[in-house]
Amino acid sequence: GVSVTDIDGNLASSQITVNNGTLSVSLAGGATISAGANGSSTMTISGSEAQINTALASIVYQSNADFNGADVFTIVSTDSAGTPLSDIDTVGITVNPVNDPPVNTLPGAQTVDEDTPLNFVGVSVNDIDGNLASTQLSVNNGTLNVTLTGGTTITAGSNGSGTLTLSGTQTDINATLASLVYQGDLNFNGSDVLTMISADSAGTPLSDTDTVSITVNP
């Protein structure tokens, strides 16, 4: 655990800091935060030695979202002598990477007239780990068409059908998604839904499913 001892009994404060995350402590023991803030990357805990140690015993570190790599926990404890003295120590923290699912972006609800093509704007996908594998698009009462860009291929379904699966790099898939066109079935009017499922290529693949409603006016 993390603790501090002052043999003279005049401990005043302990400052704790990390570079790539946040720190939280419990103040139930009576310590106060005199600088920084709970749930931030740095704070200074003040109180008696017992109060400070109670707070230090409750430290929780949370890395920043999607961060992995090396971080450093630094503690600087200072006494209240006429000429204050301090002690500085550090602990290395290794944050291992974990797979994150891809994230789809879709526009809001769409409206189009019967027998009129609808050009989708704002359809994209992002995988922060860079291992996007595929994006499946489907509708119930119409067809979808895309212009294949770069090395993107259709690995299931087909252009001009109600469902198709795009495979390729994230850049190429997004360039292809920018060309997405919906066409309702002949003489169809009513409600339809575009469903988008993007999956990554991790050992245990993760996916994101999103939908956008389409109203086809008569």
What are these regions (language model features)?
Residues 1-218:
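Extracellular glycosylation-rich, acidic/polar low-complexity regions of adhesion-
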